[in-house]
Amino acid sequence: SLGGKPDLRPCHPPCHYIPRPKPR
C-alpha cells in the first residue's frame, strides 16, 4: 500500500479471464 494505492491481490477466477460464450 505504498503511495496510497490499494494492494494488488490475485483474483479468483483471474481478472484477465472472463468466461464468455465462444463466437460462432
Curated annotation (Swiss-Prot):
Waglerin-1 selectively blocks the epsilon subunit of muscle nicotinic acetylcholine receptor (nAChR). Also has effects on rodent ionotropic GABA(A) receptors (GABR), since it potentiates I(GABA) in some neurons and depresses I(GABA) in others. In mice, it elicits tachypnea, ocular proptosis, rapid collapse and spasms, whereas no toxic effects on respiration and blood pressure are observed in rats. Waglerin-3 selectively blocks the epsilon subunit of muscle nicotinic acetylcholine receptor (nAChR). It elicits tachypnea, ocular proptosis, rapid collapse and spasms in mice. It causes death by respiratory failure. Exists in two forms, due to cis-trans isomerization at 13-Pro-Pro-14. This is Waglerin-3. Transmembrane segments: none annotated. Disulfide bonds join 11-15. It is found in: Secreted. One of its GO terms (molecular function) is toxin activity. Changing residue 9 to A: Slight decrease in lethality; in Waglerin-1. One of its GO terms (cellular component) is extracellular region. Waglerin-1 is monomeric. Belongs to the waglerin family. Expressed by the venom gland. Residues 1-10 have a biased composition (Basic and acidic residues). The keyword S-adenosyl-L-methionine does not apply. Residues 1-24 are annotated as: Disordered. Amidation of the waglerin-1 C-terminus increases the affinity by 2-fold. Keywords: Acetylcholine receptor inhibiting toxin, Disulfide bond, Ion channel impairing toxin, Neurotoxin, Postsynaptic neurotoxin, Secreted, Toxin.
